[in-house]
């Protein structure tokens, strides 16, 4: 698989990964995804307003000399959520390190043993497969089955 994907593909993968990743406090100490997802969602809500205010404030005070700087600041503010989604998209397509791949396989096996339907085990899993597996584990396994890992 080609690891170099386009920007639009990375942004789309980041959006899917953001929706797939389980937002559980048990995972926040292990993975940075929860912090990145919260910051990206906050940026999606807040940064367009900050961008508009930075430009409109200069226009309201007739400070047209500062308008180019305000536009640059607005573009930077608008780029912050895109940077978060790009990072998430890139992360979702990154292969798991060996220790996490072993953990993914054990968790996958535990879900299959419990009788839940799950996609086939990947030989070279990526973070997006881990997200799907973790999501399924938190939904279908009881706390006693998850005690070993959390």
UniProtKB/Swiss-Prot annotation:
The chain crosses the membrane at residues 42-62, 70-90. It comes from Vibrio vulnificus (strain YJ016). It is found in: Cell inner membrane. Pfam families: DUF412 (PF04217). This is UPF0208 membrane protein VV2132. Disulfide bonds: none annotated. NCBIfam families: PRK01816.1 (NF002493). GO terms for cellular component: plasma membrane. It is a multi-pass membrane protein. Keywords: Cell inner membrane, Cell membrane, Membrane, Transmembrane, Transmembrane helix.
């Amino acid at each position: 698989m080609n690891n170099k994907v386009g920007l639009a593909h990375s942004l789309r993968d980041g959006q899917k990964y953001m929706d797939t990743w389980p937002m559980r406090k048990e995972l926040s100490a292990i993975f940075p995804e929860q912090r990145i997802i919260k910051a990206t969602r906050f940026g999606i809500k807040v940064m367009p307003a900050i961008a508009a205010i930075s430009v409109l404030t200069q226009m309201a005070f007739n400070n047209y000399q500062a308008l180019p700087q305000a536009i640059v600041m607005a573009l930077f503010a608008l780029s912050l959520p895109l940077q978060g989604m790009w990072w998430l998209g890139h992360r979702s397509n990154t292969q798991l390190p060996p220790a996490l791949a072993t953990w993914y396989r054990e968790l996958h096996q535990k879900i299959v043993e419990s009788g839940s339907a799950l996609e086939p085990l990947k030989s070279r899993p990526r973070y997006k497969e881990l997200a799907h597996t973790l999501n399924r584990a938190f939904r279908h396994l009881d706390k006693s089955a998850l005690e070993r890992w959390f």
